[in-house]
Structure formats: structure tokens, C-alpha cells
Amino acid sequence: MTHPPTFPLRQDLRRIADLVTAGSRVLDIGCGDGALLAYLVAEKQVIGRGLELSPAGVHDSVSRGLSVIQGDADQDLADYPDLAFDFVILSRTLQAMRQPLDVLRHLVRIGQRAIVSIPNFGL
């Protein structure tokens, strides 16, 4: 059952959130300001972690009380152990990767399930 968010969340992020099981371990790669991760922690009680390239995004995420580190998905995903997370999310980030196939390989290695979304520039 889907509940309305307690704070604003983009429509595409709500759709991703609906795919995540309550109480699961989640890694949000390219988490930006942490909006999705904050929602998942608050509404689905996930154990959430984030990886974000932008110092401003890390600051915003940490300010929300989230466990987010600064890192580059093209380089830093190799450091994560196999099956460390139930869900690995890569939202609106794949198109910015220098090595997208390597990043996707790490996603399916790190998580039991991977959720990948890309922006629709036509909208």
C-alpha cells in the first residue's frame, strides 16, 4: 500500500520508492540532496546509505541526517562487498557515467536488486 509522502518527492522518485521493500538495506548512488533516501528511511524504515559526487549534495544529505559519503561511482563502487545491499538505486545518474557498463556490473554485484532510471529529456 502506498501512502502519500510526508514531504515533497518527485513523481519518478515515488515510483522508485514503491519498488523498495520496507526494512531493506539500500544504497542510493548519485543520491543528490538525499530526498529519495530520506523518504525511504522515514516511510519504509530502510537502512539507507548514499554515495554522491557533489560536495553540496553530500552536505544537503548529511544535513537531513543521512549516511552519505562523497564518492565517484565510476571509481568507488569496486570498494563495496558483494551483496551488501538489498537494493541499489541509480536514478538519473547512468547517463553521466564514464564507464556505464562497469557501473551496472557493480550494481548487480553489490545489491540483490538494482533499480536504474534515466531522465526523459523529451518531457
Mark where each language-model region is.
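Conserved alpha-helix/loop element of class I SAM-dependent methyltransferases that forms part
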Residues: 7-23
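Conserved class I S-adenosyl-L-methionine
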Residues: 24-32, 116-123
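Glycine-rich SAM-binding Motif I of class I
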Residues: 34-38
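Class I SAM-dependent methyltransferase SAM/SAH-binding core
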Residues: 39-76
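Short conserved loop adjoining the S-adenosyl-L-methionine
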Residues: 76-82
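A short SAM/SAH-binding and catalytic strip from SAM-dependent methyltransferases
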Residues: 87-98
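A short glycine-rich, Lys/Arg-flanked "PGG" loop and its adjoining helix->strand segment in the class I
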Residues: 101-115
